[in-house]
Amino acid sequence: MSNLSAEGFQRCFVLHRRPYSESSLILDVFSEEYGRITLMAKGARSKRSNLKGALQPFTPLLLKWSGKGSMKTLRQAEPISLGLPLFGINLYSAMYVNELVGRVLMAEVPMPALFHDYLHALTELAQCENPEPALRRFELALLSSMGYGVDFLHCAGTGEPVDPEMTYRYREQKGFIASVRRDNLTFLGNELIAISERRFVTKEQLKAAKRFTRIALKPYLGGKPLKSRELFIQTPRARSNGK
């Protein structure tokens, strides 16, 4: 059993929360120094609890906990600020980011750099009109943090720099090789350069980045669909039906 007690307050975000017993919560938390952890917040749902409104996703928190085993006990919690203003498609996008972190990261593995990427992604989602670039940058940061090393700038077959106008086919764990075919696994050189720089000038480059991250993340997510994606897909139908 792990003894991962926080000696002082730790910067955290709640990824997901669910009720436990009559008055408590189980929290899936992403912490700056300890990675993803699970906390029991005893009495957090009771009417007298001052934590009831604070332990929400997208609210920057300072948390202190103790205990052994896979589930720790929350001892103290203080909000750093109000929750980030996320609405509409940007809210669903932030929910997707939370679900990715909860599904992909192993428990209790420190990821301080990714925590900052996560914070930057949420901040960007709270301010932007189009969430797609922020999502692609975070997905690429997540893959990089897990050691998913892909060279976007060189042909895996020859070692030569990619040509912006040429087509390259992705081969898992190998990289990109020159190809004359065009399908779901092929990308233009300028798209690979854009993905490497995480800077998307055209819609085509942004679509290519989305296609690549879906391919790369699929083994980590398994066959279980993402709930946030399903909710987002259902939303336009609900609106058209007047719900």
Curated annotation (Swiss-Prot):
| Species of origin | Vibrio parahaemolyticus serotype O3:K6 (strain RIMD 2210633)
**GO terms, biological process:** DNA recombination; double-strand break repair
The UniProt function text for this chain reads: Involved in DNA repair and RecF pathway recombination.
Q: Which UniProt keywords apply?
A: DNA damage, DNA recombination, DNA repair
Gene Ontology cellular component annotations, sorted alphabetically: bacterial nucleoid
Q: Kindly indicate whether the keyword DNA repair belongs to this entry.
A: yes
- The gene is recO
The family line of this record is: Belongs to the RecO family.
Name of the protein this chain belongs to: DNA repair protein RecO
InterPro entries assigned: ARFGAP/RecO, DNA_rep/recomb_RecO_N, NA-bd_OB-fold, RecO, RecO_C
